[in-house]
Amino acid sequence: MSGHHLILGQMVDYLTGESITDTHDERYRQALAKQLVEEKGYQKSDILPRRKLIVAAGDKCAQIQIDLTVVLEDVVAMIIRYGPGSLVTRHRPALAASRVVAAYQIHIVVVTNGLDADVLHGKTGSILSKGLDSIPHRQNLLDRCRTHTNEPISPKRIEAEQRILYAYDVDDSCPCDDTICKV
């Protein structure tokens, strides 16, 4: 056991086939990836697991992880952030991530604890729907991407969103969280 995360051994990542650490949290992430492919019509190749993202806050810098990044037709269309517990407390850092992960505003942001989900409008932050079943199907998300422009994010906004993300994900992280790396 490392910190408070119970290590259950090794498991095979559903999307990549790689061997990864088996934890309760990872089991939720794997179930979500499987749901996206088997129920929502996504291809495994549409979904990037554990995408690393560098964020800065002044002279501080860290690498964080985006649990699932969905890319359709070379556009980052949706990010999914997992975290146990309350969903509402995870809205703001997920929205910040959606404004940093690409040079444009991501259309859909999903916050989930593995049992429930809030699907957020990337630009406004408003809740579009609730529940794991309400995560958009691949074709719906693709249609949305084709009909909405990819609005660029200004450098000033990116800097502010990185600071927010740093505060939530790095400053407030558990010391045993090995997905966060200060650089």
Name each model-derived stretch:
Residues 1-108, 118-183:
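A short, conserved, highly charged catalytic patch centered on acidic carboxylates
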